[in-house]
Amino acid sequence: HSSTLVTAGIYLLIRFNNLLIETMFIKFLLLISGLTMFMAGISANYEFDLKKIIALSTLSQLGLMMSILSMGYYELAYFHLLTHAMFKALLFMCAGKVIHLMNDNQDIRLMGGMSLYIPLTSLCFNISNLALCGIPFLAGFYSKDLILEVVSMSNLNFMVFYLYYISTGLTMFYTIRLMMYLMVNDYNLLVIYNLFEEDYIMLNSMFILLFMSLISGSFLSWMIFSYPYMIYLPFNMKMMVIYVSLIGLLMGGLISNMKIYSLNKFMLTYNLSF
């Protein structure tokens, strides 16, 4: 999944960046990748399938990498590729474990209260989710914030600017919604739950990835860039990422508290099972 979707596609374009940058196709790529980022963020907010939400968040980050690549900043795309690999791998491992413990069920409306039953997995899940949002000093912050500041410095039009920032807000939106459904709301699947935290073989790998999700951003930013980027922005532009993230957080919290269920009536068939 990751090899085909993210690594092969982005890495090939990074390698062929000098050829691509000369063509007219690059502006078209910027538009398409910006719209991909935006649409993936919107779609993830309407999904109730855990794996689909994480897959759409991967697609959103793919759009982010493609768009910064199409602006000519291939080293930033590579940096984000590496940091994103750390926390997204952790996120997929946590999701796989949760789905397995939920009796192979993927619907987030049936999950809830995970932080009480599987605390270590919940810890890994939440930290990787926050790294995805670009919370300061986690892995995602160093690459994502730098990309957004470089975009703010560039001389592109407002459409690209809005696409970037709205997509960042949407990332926070669906992440908080997911965390509310999984960690805060009530457990809804069975009368007796079979959640347990004893899979230490998997937890070892998860803790290594957790450690990398915490330190890989600053570590790689020292290793990859030979000199720091000169970014000169007014205070409000600098704080723009924080503003959209806070709006996304507020919206995610409000929406997940409302009893909004999709028009899909397939969920009613679960009543026949028990």
Locations of regions flagged by a protein language model:
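Core, highly hydrophobic multi-pass alpha-helical transmembrane subunits of bioenergetic inner membranes
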Residues: 1-274
